[in-house]
Amino acid sequence: MAGIKYGMRPKIHANEMAVSGGVQVGVKYGAISVDHLEQMGQAEIESLKGSETMPTVLPGCAFFLNLPLSPARDMINAGLPVAMASDFNPGTSPSGNMQLILSMACIRYRLTPEEALNATTLNTAYAMGVSDELGSITRGKVANLIVTQPMTQLEFMPYYYGANKVAKMMLNGKFV
């Protein structure tokens, strides 16, 4: 925890394979996020209440390793924000496909499309410590966004879980 004195908030890899106490340690030390959370009970959910620690669910890892699903719906029902990210890495989650993560959020974790969009944008930006500049379409923030192919409502985004619905992508205010 030496980084705290230099303004660095910890990120805790917690409760992926077993209930480890990592969630409570993260909250105790003011971690910006606790990540994975496949093994969570009510005690862990309660410990997150009132904290500034973002619970971050990694659906790609749970899918690839055939782990239990994090109780994202229970966390939201308890009044907690939830972030969802890909955990893109070659060992446990070899996909950075955020459209798939958004679909999994709705289909497997039972988030509404609005909750899933929030979990994969603003809440994830918070979990990375960059929500002041990224994560939402707000004056003064960096314009990183996607433009989808035409769809009549947000609910169609997670529905097309196997198709690329991105028509254009903007990074730093410029289409790429």
Where are these regions (language model features)?
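Metal-dependent enolase-superfamily TIM-barrel catalytic cores that perform enediolate-based chemistry
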Residues: 1-20
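Short, electropositive alpha-helical surface patch
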Residues: 2-4, 70, 145-146
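Structural beta-strand/beta-sheet cores of well-ordered domains, especially the beta-sheet scaffolds
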Residues: 8, 51-53, 143, 167
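Acidic active-site catalytic centers that drive phospho-/nucleotidyl reactions
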Residues: 15, 35, 87, 144, ...
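Active-site-adjacent C-terminal substructures of enzyme catalytic domains
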Residues: 19-133, 161
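C-terminal cap of metal-dependent C-N hydrolases
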Residues: 122, 142-176
